[in-house]
């Protein structure tokens, strides 16, 4: 019997498993899932040492681009073989952005972790000094750059500063005359979204959701009414929880609408003067995510229960005065995706692309028609898309960032139903001296 080299074993196992999964999905959709047996995961643990040695060799400075591509062909990317290593090395990546020059920004670590902001380009990975968190306005013009001193807003990445904003004190919007404590440290942003005029920033954090402006911060969540109710019930100020779970937010590209939510609220929509205009009951237990479509005339709202969820859509024209309850059957808030707990998402012409708890990127139309799915693995933690809608970047809790060329054809090793090909991935793993490109 001929002895195969490790890369041959890896390549054959990865491609065979991807094809088996894709066939399984195709059969299930065509014929139903009854009596279908899921493909067996191939044994690849014994190949990990050889894979790591080859990966390290492909990242040496003297390795040519041709050699790197040959490595990728011999050792095609896959999630399942890496599972034994993830408990030790995997970590969340809380934010990614595609810059106009094709480079990437990534914040390694989740919001509550110290983390590090890095810039990734074809030449390597470089720390971004003096920036601890970042965000970009929905019109793609302004960037918010945060550190312990406050938030700078710049016109373009590396462009001139147009605004400098202070972090909230933590006392904003709380009833006067009670001994509430200010923040000891600035909130750790879950999201930092400049408004399209560059003058204000939506700060979403586990310590509260605020709008930062030159004249101070305005608290949006938790709402003062909730605090007043707790005080009226006799709860001591120090016992009132001001923290949020599953906090999220979005700003429309024209700046007219602000969407916020958290585990204990409905989906809340405010106008540009921060007046409440809509309260939309979620399609599952806990509001979890919000996203506007590319045209800005539809809003996507996801809620979750455990690792599943339901996603509603609502026309922006229907927002003023809209009030619906949990699990409402209101025709103005149709269900457009059933099943996904959405952690990240982007929109392009006529299509939403969301990242779910099971490591899938799922695309569907504004009418809810399913388009395709693409498997990355772990849980998707952050996403961005290029202005032309042709390049997608997705990050996961496995410490992986992947760049995907949309509509470019699907390689044989890719699990998915869409014609999309990953062109590069990076592993930002705990315990490694440096990130490695795959």
Q: What is each PLM-predicted segment?
A:
Residues 112-118, 149-155, 207-213, 264-269, ...:
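Structural motif
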Residues 101-102, 139-140, 197-198, 254-255, ...:
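Conserved loop/turn motif of beta-propeller repeat scaffolds
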Residues 104-105, 143, 201, 258, ...:
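Hydrophobic beta-strand positions that form the internal "hydrophobic ladder"
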């Amino acid at each position: 019997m001929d002895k195969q080299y490790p890369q041959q074993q890896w390549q054959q196992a990865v491609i065979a498993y991807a094809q088996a999964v894709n066939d399984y999905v195709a059969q299930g959709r065509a014929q139903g899932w009854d009596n279908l047996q899921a493909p067996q995961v191939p044994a690849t643990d014994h190949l990990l040492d050889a894979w790591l040695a080859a990966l390290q060799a492909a990242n040496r400075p003297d390795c040519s681009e041709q050699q790197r591509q040959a490595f990728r062909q011999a050792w095609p990317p896959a999630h399942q073989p890496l599972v034994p290593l993830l408990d030790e090395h995997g970590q969340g990546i809380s934010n990614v952005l595609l810059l106009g020059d094709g480079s990437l920004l990534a914040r390694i670590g989740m919001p509550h972790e110290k983390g590090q902001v890095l810039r990734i380009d074809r030449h390597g990975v470089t720390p971004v000094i003096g920036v601890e968190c970042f965000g970009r306005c929905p019109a793609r013009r302004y960037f918010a750059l945060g550190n312990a001193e406050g938030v700078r807003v710049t016109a373009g990445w590396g462009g001139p500063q147009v605004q400098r904003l202070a972090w909230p004190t933590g006392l904003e919007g709380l009833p006067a005359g009670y001994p509430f404590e200010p923040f000891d440290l600035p909130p750790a942003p879950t999201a930092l979204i400049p408004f399209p005029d560059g003058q204000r920033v939506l700060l979403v954090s586990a310590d509260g959701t605020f709008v930062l402006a030159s004249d101070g911060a305005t608290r949006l969540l938790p709402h003062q009414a909730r605090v007043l109710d707790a005080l009226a019930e006799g709860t001591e100020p120090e016992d009132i929880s001001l923290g949020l779970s599953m906090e999220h937010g979005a700003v429309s590209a024209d700046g007219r609408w602000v969407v916020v939510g958290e585990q204990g609220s409905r989906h809340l929509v405010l106008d540009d003067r921060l007046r409440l205009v809509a309260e939309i009951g979620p399609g599952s237990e806990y509001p979890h995510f919000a996203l506007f479509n590319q045209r800005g005339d539809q809003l996507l709202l996801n809620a979750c229960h455990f690792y599943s969820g339901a996603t509603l859509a609502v026309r922006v024209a229907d927002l003023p005065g809209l009030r619906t309850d949990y699990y409402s059957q209101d025709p103005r808030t149709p269900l457009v995706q059933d099943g996904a707990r959405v952690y990240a998402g982007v929109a392009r012409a006529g299509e939403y692309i969301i990242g779910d708890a099971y490591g899938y990127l799922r695309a569907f139309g504004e009418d809810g028609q399913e388009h395709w799915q693409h498997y990355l693995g772990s849980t998707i933690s952050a996403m961005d898309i290029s202005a032309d809608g042709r390049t997608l970047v997705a990050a996961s809790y496995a410490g992986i960032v992947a760049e995907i060329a949309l509509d470019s054809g699907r390689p044989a090793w890719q699990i998915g139903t869409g014609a999309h090909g990953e062109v590069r991935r990076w592993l930002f793993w705990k315990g490694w001296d440096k990130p490695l490109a795959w």
